[in-house]
Regions:
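Short beta-strand elements
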Residues: 7-20, 31, 389-392, 427-440
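Short, aromatic- and glycine-rich surface loops/edge beta-strands on solvent-exposed regions
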Residues: 1-6, 413-424
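Aromatic sugar-binding surface patches on proteins
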Residues: 395-404
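Extracellular Ig-like/FN3 beta-sandwich strand-entry sites
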Residues: 350, 367, 411-417
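Active-site region of glycoside hydrolase catalytic domains
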Residues: 2-4, 71, 116-232, 285
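Substrate-binding clefts and catalytic carboxylate motifs of secreted carbohydrate-active enzymes
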Residues: 132, 162, 192-386, 390-396
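Active-site-adjacent substrate/metal-binding segments within catalytic domains
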Residues: 4-101, 105-141, 232-272
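Short, surface-exposed loop/turn segments at beta-strand-coil junctions that are enriched for proline
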Residues: 404-412
């Protein structure tokens, strides 16, 4: 008490931890290297509609999917979301709400600096806070007179935020400082040979796009615009024609239901293979990966695992299979290596693949059983198989086996499935599959 009056006080929770990035772009949480299996998140287009009754079920589902980090990009959420992440132990990568093209004049820099200082003051004591970005994508392409955001605005914002938080990493913007987006078949060509990509340590957007279920689609596209698609209407609600038919090369099909299924199947396979591809590069050099997005922010054609009404896209089940702490997967030895595309091998060749065993746990797991088999989908004949026991080393990504299957004339035109499983006693740690086709 001071002169009979109680002093002003502020109560807040805080956490003491250390999250640092080394020179190779790897993350260390309390001196332990951590592989970040992340998720981009936006609760709603209108933040006022969101609250704990929405966030908590979302985050509990994420934790069951083994997601350990969230990236809030291009906006801020209400304080309660960050408090919930504090309690649940979800690591937060917060991006200042700047995206694409803004002015780089002195007035803009001054006002943005005040705002980023406020953002830092609001969030820096949250236990969940791990890292910052001052801008989502500061370098805009296809503009004849683009502003100098990266070399002028971003550096001022970084220095301003560092006055509030001198400890955590402050990142200048995507496509810089070891940070990149890959959206195969959505924002980039689905025929990209990913072996030619230079992959940095932090992939803060990966994913694809598909059309939500018919029940959801009917809530925002008028019935008379549904089929055949009225493309102007569909593009207004998020379907980009060139991305769908030129990048993803999705087939329209003979009905609206077929079109929806074709887009959802492509997204599911593309995202699954993007995850496998990035996890096979664990610490070589990939250290973090964030799917774009958890859910659609409004009724739209989007990139979420869930649509606006939290109805799952097909990709939801596919992602659950490959975001597990332990992962077994096959990497076909094929060139060019295209994610989301059917893998074609020819008669007279051998189907060859590396079998990966990935363990994100901090403990080794001894005496696990790894099994794989290749089955002819046309005849159900098992073409080859193997099983053996091994120790999964802590926090590792290894190739303990290879598949080599000569392809004879009898397999011409056949589709084959590769089934893989890692188990410990009666517990299945990872179960996965992939497909390839044999052509003449």
């Amino acid at each position: 008490l001071v002169l009979g009056w109680q002093e002003d006080t502020v109560k807040c929770r805080f956490g003491i931890k250390e999250i640092v990035q080394d020179d190779a772009g790897q993350w260390y949480l309390n001196n332990k290297r951590i592989f970040v299996r992340g998720m981009r998140y936006i609760s709603r287009r209108w933040m006022s509609e969101a609250g704990e009754e929405m966030w908590k079920p979302d985050f509990e589902k994420m934790i069951r999917m083994n997601i350990n980090s969230i990236r809030i990009g291009s906006h801020m959420e209400k304080d309660g979301l960050y408090s919930l992440c504090d309690e649940l132990g979800l690591l937060m990568w917060q991006v200042f709400p700047l995206h694409y093209c803004v002015s780089d004049d002195d007035d803009m820099i001054s006002r943005a600096s005040d705002m980023i200082r406020d953002m830092g003051m609001m969030l820096t004591n949250h236990a969940c806070m791990g890292m910052w970005s001052v801008y989502k994508e500061p370098e805009i392409y296809q503009l004849p007179d683009k502003p100098n955001n990266y070399f002028r605005l971003c550096h001022v914002l970084k220095e301003t935020l560092k006055t509030v938080d001198p400890v955590r990493w402050v990142h200048l913007g995507d496509y810089r400082e070891g940070v990149m987006n890959i959206m195969i078949g959505c924002c980039s060509d689905g025929d990209t040979d990913v072996d030619d990509l230079i992959i940095p340590p932090n992939i803060v957007e990966f994913g694809s796009q598909s059309i939500p279920c018919l029940e959801t689609l009917r809530t925002f596209i008028p019935e008379d615009k549904l089929w055949p698609p009225h493309w102007d209407t569909w593009e207004y609600w998020g379907l980009f024609y060139s991305n769908t038919f030129e990048f993803a090369k999705v087939e329209l099909g003979n009905s609206l239901e077929e079109f929806i299924e074709n887009t959802q199947e492509y997204e599911a396979v593309s995202v699954k293979e993007q995850i496998e591809f990035l996890r096979m590069k664990k610490y070589d050099p990939v250290s973090s990966m964030y799917l774009y997005y958890w859910s659609d922010a409004c009724p739209m054609i989007g990139s979420g695992l869930l649509d606006y009404y939290r109805r799952p896209y097909k990709v939801y089940d596919y992602m659950q299979k490959v975001y597990t702490p332990v992962l077994v997967c096959a990497q076909p030895c094929i060139h060019p290596y295209k994610l989301g595309r059917e893998k074609i091998f020819h008669v007279g060749m051998s189907y060859t693949a590396r079998v990966w065993a990935i363990n994100d746990n901090y403990e080794s797991i001894s005496d696990v059983l790894l099994q794989w088999k290749v089955t002819d989908c046309e005849t159900d004949e098992i073409l080859c198989r193997n099983s053996f026991r091994l120790e999964l080393l802590a926090d590792s990504a290894e190739i303990p086996d290879h598949i080599v299957l000569p392809l004879g004339e009898e397999l011409s035109g056949h589709r084959c499935r590769v089934d893989m499983k890692i188990s410990s006693g009666n517990e299945v740690l990872s179960e996965n599959d992939s497909y390839f086709r044999v052509e003449p």
